[in-house]
A protein has these predicted regions:
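Active-site gating loops and adjacent loop-to-helix segments of metal-dependent hydrolytic enzymes
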Residues: 68-96, 146, 151-157, 192-208
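Histidine/acidic residue-rich metal-binding segments in metalloenzymes
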Residues: 127, 169-188, 192-228
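N-terminal metal-binding scaffold of metallo-dependent hydrolase/deaminase domains
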Residues: 1-42, 55-56
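Divalent metal-coordination and catalytic microenvironments
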Residues: 8, 25, 30, 52, ...
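Mid-domain alpha/beta scaffold segments of enzyme catalytic cores
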Residues: 118-161, 168-173
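Divalent metal-dependent hydrolysis catalytic cores, especially in the metallo-beta-lactamase
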Residues: 89-90, 100-125, 139-150, 182-196, ...
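Short, acidic/polar
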Residues: 96-104, 165-177
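Metal-associated gating/positioning segment near the N- to mid-region
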Residues: 54-131
Length: 228
């Protein structure tokens, strides 16, 4: 189906963009073909009248944890204990997966059409990515990392990242991630904000440099990019 989006205010996403009117966006096979004057003959297109609403390119969120809604926490919680409870039974895993799918759909409804996940529950992210691609779930395009790699006591260790005690542990998780067909590898190299218990921990180096190097070298050799 070919679509023509008319009667809208276009924001084209460029650095110096200005609202544009009296134009029409032509879409063929799910891709933008052209932006033309609204006087163009549109008989080959299904017209979508925007009634003066804004239209802009889909946004991209490069740092997403689908295990949470993104809303501020009212108080600090034991994420490792919470995740262990969630993943301990098929019932709680099913409920959690529905929540994850809902959070992804919220991103899409907010105008975010592509997300990159950087630490999640088990292999939920790749599963959801594949279901969205298959059309059985509604959501944005997902570049998925599944669980990240951290170290004992490190950022998100035991929740949305595994705690690797050694280089061999880290490489074993890397191998598992590749089997899950992730799009990228996520490392938790420094202390984070949400689970910090002391001032100064966020940004503090936690993962040994030799572990970082070993993971990156193996991931790159296998064709994966690494986020940290």
């Amino acid at each position: 189906m070919n679509y023509a989006f008319t009667n809208g205010i276009i924001l084209d996403g460029t650095r110096d963009m200005k609202p544009q009117t009296n134009l029409c966006i032509l879409v063929q096979d799910g891709k933008i073909k052209d932006i033309v004057p609204d006087t163009t003959d549109l008989h080959d297109y299904k017209i979508v009248d925007l009634h003066g609403h804004y239209i802009l390119p889909g946004l991209i969120n490069m740092h997403v944890h689908l295990a949470g809604s993104g809303k501020p926490q009212k108080k600090q919680r034991d994420n490792e204990k919470l995740v262990n409870t969630i993943m301990s039974s098929s019932l709680t895993r099913t409920i959690a997966y529905k929540m994850v799918a809902g959070f992804a759909k919220d991103e899409l409804l907010g105008g975010v059409t592509t997300i990159r996940t950087v630490g999640g529950l088990g292999s939920f992210d790749t599963r959801l990515r594949d279901e969205i691609q298959a059309g059985t779930k509604t959501g944005p395009r997902i570049l998925a990392s599944n669980q990240g790699i951290s170290v004992p006591g490190g950022h998100m260790a035991g929740s949305v990242a595994v705690a690797a005690s050694s280089i061999s542990d880290a490489l074993a998780h890397l191998e598992q991630s590749e089997k899950e067909k992730v799009n990228l590898i996520k490392l938790m190299i420094t202390g984070g904000v949400l689970d910090a218990k002391e001032k100064g921990v966020p940004g503090e180096l936690k993962m040994p440099p030799e572990m970082v190097r070993a993971i990156c070298e193996k991931a790159h050799a296998d064709g994966y990019l690494v986020a940290a």
